[in-house]
Each structure stands twice: as structure tokens, then as C-alpha cells.
Amino acid sequence: MRSSEWIALLYFLYLAIVCWLRPVVLPRRAVITGVSAVLVGVIVFVARSAPVFARDWAPFVYVSVAYYLTGHLFIAPSERLEAWLLKWDHRWFGDPTIRFARWPAWLIAYLDLIYTLCFLLLPGGFAALALTGHSSQANHYWTMVLAADLGAFAPLSVFQTRPPWAIEKPAELAASRLHRLASYVVKNATTGVNTFPSGHVAVTLAVALGVITTLPIAGIVFLVCAASIAIGCVVGRYHYAVDVLAGAALGLGVCALTAAFGA
């Protein structure tokens, strides 16, 4: 099996075990355990029997399922941890809900849009490699991406917090209509909980670094997107600033380890 497949398999085993070690309600435990067992079987089957094309793209399915399944671990927010995270936001930005009110509407619209479409960067990075004849780098790419994203999801079993938008007054931003639309998508199409470190930042940085050594121009574009998402996390109140910094550190660390030990 590829290293990326092992990462996914071990993560689903982790979910199946940790849900019984935390006070998760029984129906959720059943869902987490059952879906995790199915995914372990799927990963093994794909690794052994699926065509190379399917195997190359399957990690995007694994990480997507893992994201929503991890959300089932959420029990109750740690208000003490939330207060600590907010303290740093207020120390650095004053009142972050009004700090960016004077930023131009086009910039706010761009940040909201790139944040909302973050999930497209994961297959987008591999598509850039595959379409330029570098599909052989699938395992290297997905090892970085899965390790970064799942590494951000895993601590949710312990560090349980709500995103800033769930506990603050609405942010005052110039592009209010688009921000309301982006907020609606975030509230209704995501798990609605906060990941510490930020999965958005960790994984998009991994996407960029997974592409840049082979396709420098494309990698720079993805790097700009990753930086924009990091800024958008704080401006749109989707993440705390500490989440963003921790996510960047995680993404860099994962990519450094992958480069050092190979994939």
C-alpha cells in the first residue's frame, strides 16, 4: 500500500477507536465505527484491485469522508479554550468583528470566495500534476495533503471549540451580501465546529508545496491561494488567528517530513 493509503487507513482506525474513549453518544459512535470500518475496507480494496486512475484520485474521497465523520466527535465546546483563542485575536486585532470593516469590498469578496471554495484546491492540485504528465507523483502529493488535513482533524477529539462566527456578533464587512452567502454555506455545508490547527490553512499549504517543486508557476498560484485563505479565515471570522498559525506550522512540518523521508 502507498503511504497516503496507510495514512487514511490509520486515521479511520483512529476514529473507530477514539469515539469509544470519549463520551460520544451511542448513535454517533455507531456511525463513526460503521463508516470507518467501511472506509478501511474500501481503502484496502482500492489499493489491491482498483485501476491506477481510481487509486490516484481516491484520497480526495477519503479526506472528504474523514472531515464530516470527525465532526461527529464533537461533544461540547471548551469555553476556557475558546476564551484563550479569542484573547489572542483581541490582543492582535482589537475587536476583530469591526477591525476589517474598512477593507475594500472587492478584497472581502475575494477572501470569502477563495475560503468557500477551498475544498476545490485539493483535487485541483493533483489535476495540475496529472494534466501535465506528472500523475506518478500521486502518492507524494496525497501523502502531504492527507497528513496535513487529517493531522488538523485529529485533535478535535480533545480540543473542542466553536468557530468565532458562532460566538461573536456578525462581522462588519464591506461585501456584506457575499459574506452572508459564504457564512450560509459555512453554517450549512460544514461540520460547524472549529479545528485546531486550521485544516484549511494546513491542507492548502500542503497542496501548494506538493505542486511547487514540479510546477513552480502553478505552485506559486496555489501558494497565493493558501495565503489568501489564511487571511480570509481571520477576516471572515471562520477561524481564530492561533488556529491559522498552528495550521501553517502543521502544513510546513508535514511537507518537511515528507520531503525528508520520501513518500
What do these predicted regions represent?
Residues 1-191, 205, 209-224, 228-231, ...:
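Terminal transmembrane helix and immediately flanking juxtamembrane interfaces
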Residues 192-203:
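Membrane-interface micro-motifs in multi-pass membrane enzymes
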